[in-house]
Regions:
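Cys/His-rich Zn2+-binding cysteine-cluster or related metal-binding knuckle/ribbon modules and their
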Residues: 2-13, 23-51
């Protein structure tokens, strides 16, 4: 499985997210500019550590 398909599968784990929506999320994430993607990952990590 390539990285993109792994990302799709990870989004499918979200409640209420089916295969088409997961693919849309994955396309959105990979199309982000580097700065926004980096901030998104940093924010996710911080939220996980503090919640």
């Amino acid at each position: 499985m390539d990285s993109f398909e792994k990302l799709v599968q990870m989004f499918r784990e979200f409640p209420g997210i089916g295969p088409r929506q997961a693919r849309r999320f994955a396309f959105f994430v990979v199309s982000l500019n580097y700065s926004f993607a980096h901030d998104l990952l940093k924010t996710l990590n911080n939220a996980k550590e503090t919640v």
